[in-house]
Amino acid sequence: MKRAYDCAAPQACNAHSLINKRLNDEEMRAIMEKNKQSELTGRYQAAADSLVDKLKKDTNVIAVILCGSLSYDQVWEKSDIDMALVVRDQVLKNDSFCIVEDDITVNINSIVTRSGFKRYLESLSGGSMLHSLYARGKIIYSTDESLYEYFEEFKIMGSDDRALTVLLSASELYYYYEKCQKWLQVKENPLYAQYYLLKAAEVIARIEVCARGEIPDREALVKAYEENPGLMSAYYSDAMSHQYSPPEIRHAAEEMERYMERHLDIIKKPILEYMSDHEMKTVTMISKFFKTESHFIIGILEYLAEKGIIAKVSQTIKITPKSRLAIEEIAFQYIN
């Protein structure tokens, strides 16, 4: 008569062998994927190097800046290559091109002259997507050594840029907050109200990354969720995993407002600095100063007025210089 463990031993050995085989298969797949990725990266890098070698022969090209995934992240088979060029001073007919190198698309996103290079970078709003695109980039060729130092300085996000980015992001966040409330309370459509919570996730992530002194980029949402899942889950992971009930949406919207209140100091900073002369500023004046649209910034201005930080007033204006009819435009004033 066979003992129980005599029968069990071969089964245990077979199971152990099967587990080892699966582990070996997984390890082999991982190695193959790693090799495939290495080959792909090498191909993209070779394409970039090949194009740079060609550009070096053009005496008009002063510098080449590599941007996008190849400069700091991981490329995949459908990636393209992003570059920017600095050229000698001249009148340019085109400021961008889409070219091909080794059957890979290369986007020359901008072509700027040497004298206009600094002005171009300074024109980019601190924390904007273009700012982040170039901030994650690197100069891979230059005949002007001074460009290296200036480009690295450009990547630093100062306190003023940080505050401006938070202000403009808060403007967008307040818009989503109001839309969420409208579709929940007035339209009685909680599903569409939840859509605005999802849109708010990216804006909150931008503020979170910016508040840490980093330049927000395309991966801001991933970073913010990793750093603060407790905050982001209501607008990101939880909001994507199931349909919220009206009370859940209401709670998330209320948390959104409390989030803005916690960041009031940095949100109001650019506005109060601009209004420090205590003169009335129309919404048109404010939007021009911050290089945005009136309809985009009015919401956060009214929010600051509701909080008693600035006063909402009006100023008589004319639609055109030749208009006789005077109308009232919304304005704001800082009364300390």
Residue ranges and their predicted role:
Residues K2-A4, P10-A12, T316:
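Intrinsically disordered, low-complexity segments enriched in serine/proline and basic residues
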Residues D6-A8, A15-S17, D25-E26:
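Short hydrophobic alpha-helical segments enriched in small aliphatic residues
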Residues C13, R22-I62, G299, I335-N336:
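Helical scaffold of the NTase/Pol beta-like nucleotidyltransferase catalytic core
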Residues R29-L40, A46, E101-E188:
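Conserved NTP/Mg2+-binding pocket subregion across the NTase superfamily
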Residues I65-R114:
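Catalytic metal-binding acidic patch
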Residues D161-N336:
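Conserved nucleotidyltransferase catalytic core and NTase-mimicking acidic/glycine-rich helix/loop elements
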